[in-house]
Amino acid sequence: MIAPLVCLDPGHGTPPAIGRQVEPIGPGSRELKIKDGGGALGEAPVALAIALRARRLLLARGYRVAMTRTGPTIHLGDGDGNIARARFCNRRHAALMVRIHADGSTDRSQHGFSTLVPAWHRGWTDDIYARSLRAGRALQRSALAATGAADRGVVQRSDLTGFNWADVPAVLVETGFMTNPTESRRLKTGAYQQRVALGLVRGIAAFVSG
């Protein structure tokens, strides 16, 4: 029996010249969205560190793992935007695509962990909506248990290109706020990154086995 494949997508890491380009927000859409706004200060390396830790834990549990990037910069080809990230996971028939990010806000007091999932949209996400929602709830629950972070909930989004082009269940975890001084310091520590990764992996396992 072939082990399930989990596709980890550490956010950002797109070269600025490419990130400023635009791409359709969904298949057949005339609405265009920037490929990569750059994220919060320090977000890209934190996302990668958590993803690499999650990969090690998943491999130890017998899962197969694919990653959209394993270094500072993404090199997928295919435009290197969020469409390319989704297609990378689609081609591998991933059991789940986990997009790993950290949040940001002009309000430095904002803090906590949230999981974004695709909103239902006919022709775009209708085939992955229910499974993505189930996965999102599983990851949010397990991540909170592992980290003790404040619960910002599971949020449905219709405006994320990486969701709208996905043909496999997909979630996006906002692991904390880089703009909150306390949370930013925590997210940069290996110990906390390991707790986040463990929470994600437990949630992934609960979803895949369910």
Functional labels for PLM-detected ranges:
Residues 128-159:
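Active-site-adjacent substrate-binding region
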Residues 41-49, 76-83, 126-134, 187-195:
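Soluble non-cytosolic domains of exported or imported proteins
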Residues 1-86, 119:
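Active-site histidine-acidic residue metal-binding/catalytic motifs
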Residues 12-15, 40-41, 71-75, 102-107, ...:
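Solvent-exposed loop/turn segments at secondary-structure junctions
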Residues 81-95, 160-165:
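Mature extracellular/periplasmic domains of secretome proteins
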Residues 52-63, 90-94, 102, 140-149, ...:
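Sec-exported extracytoplasmic/periplasmic mature domains
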Residues 5-9, 64-66, 96-101, 114-116, ...:
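Soluble periplasmic/extracytoplasmic beta-strand elements of cell-envelope proteins
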Residues 99-107, 116, 150-210:
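Active-site-adjacent mobile loop/cap segments within catalytic or ligand-binding domains
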